[in-house]
């Protein structure tokens, strides 16, 4: 599915369209469709951190045309390491997707309001052994 990027992704401001695809039951991929060939691996945060919660600022809600009835998904970018346990998740910049109109944004959260969220939080912190 092709998603329209409604607000620039940090470091990838020229990207306006991305291809969304499922990797497996845990991970998905966003691949750039605009010039530069890059992709992100994302994770559904609720699979590893069920208490993950944040408010989507009104600005982003308007960009996505979100309503309480919207079919919305939230993912977080994963930095893949040699092992899954060493891989990190960016909980400070979730990707919000409105499946009703195929739009997406990366929401940048304020560390003052979300002191327990980090840019590079190891997945090992959330995997039960």
UniProtKB/Swiss-Prot annotation:
Classify the main location.
Answer: cytoplasm
For this protein, the record's InterPro entries field holds:
Flagellar_assembly_factor_FliW, Flagellar_assmbl_FliW_dom_sf
Q: Which SUPFAM superfamilies match?
A: BH3618-like
A GO CC annotation given for this chain: cytoplasm
Task: Explain the consequences of disrupting this gene.
Answer: Cells grow faster and are about 55% less motile in a swarming assay, flagellar filaments are severely shortened. Decreased levels of flagellins FlaA and FlaB but not FlaC accumulate; 3-fold more flaA and 4-fold less flaB mRNA accumulate in mid-log phase. In double csrA-fliW deletions, flagellin levels are slightly lower than wild-type.
**So which domain of life are we looking at?**
Bacteria
Q: Give UniProt keywords alphabetically.
A: Bacterial flagellum biogenesis, Chaperone, Cytoplasm, Translation regulation
Its subcellular locations are:
Cytoplasm
User: Some GO term, biological process aspect, for this entry: which one?
Assistant: regulation of translation
Q: What Pfam family is a match for this entry? A: FliW
What is annotated about its quaternary structure and interactions? Interacts with flagellins FlaA and FlaB but not with FlaC; recognizes glycosylated and non-glycosylated FlaA equally. Interacts with CsrA. May form a 3-way complex of flagellin, FliS and FliW simultaneously in which FliS and FliW do not directly interact.
The similarity annotation says:
Belongs to the FliW family.
Role description: Acts as an anti-CsrA protein, binds CsrA and prevents it from repressing translation of its target genes, one of which is flagellin. Binds to flagellin and participates in the assembly of the flagellum. Overexpression leads to increased levels of FlaA and FlaB, but levels of FlaC remain stable. Involved in post-transcriptional regulation of flagellin biosynthesis.
| Entry protein name | Flagellar assembly factor FliW
Q: Which organism is it from?
A: Campylobacter jejuni subsp. jejuni serotype O:6 (strain 81116 / NCTC 11828)
Provide the gene name from the record. fliW
């Amino acid at each position: 599915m092709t998603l329209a990027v409604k607000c620039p992704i940090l470091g990838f401001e020229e990207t306006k369209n991305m291809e969304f695809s499922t990797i497996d039951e845990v991970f998905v991929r966003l691949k750039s469709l605009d010039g530069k060939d890059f992709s992100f691996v994302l994770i559904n945060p609720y699979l590893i951190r069920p208490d993950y919660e944040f408010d989507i600022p009104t600005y982003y809600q308007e960009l996505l045309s979100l309503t309480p009835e919207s079919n919305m998904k939230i993912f977080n970018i994963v930095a893949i390491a040699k092992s899954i346990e060493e891989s990190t998740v960016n909980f400070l910049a979730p990707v919000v997707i409105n499946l009703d109109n195929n739009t997406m944004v990366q929401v940048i959260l304020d560390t003052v309001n979300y002191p327990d969220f980090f840019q590079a939080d190891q997945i090992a912190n959330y995997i039960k052994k």
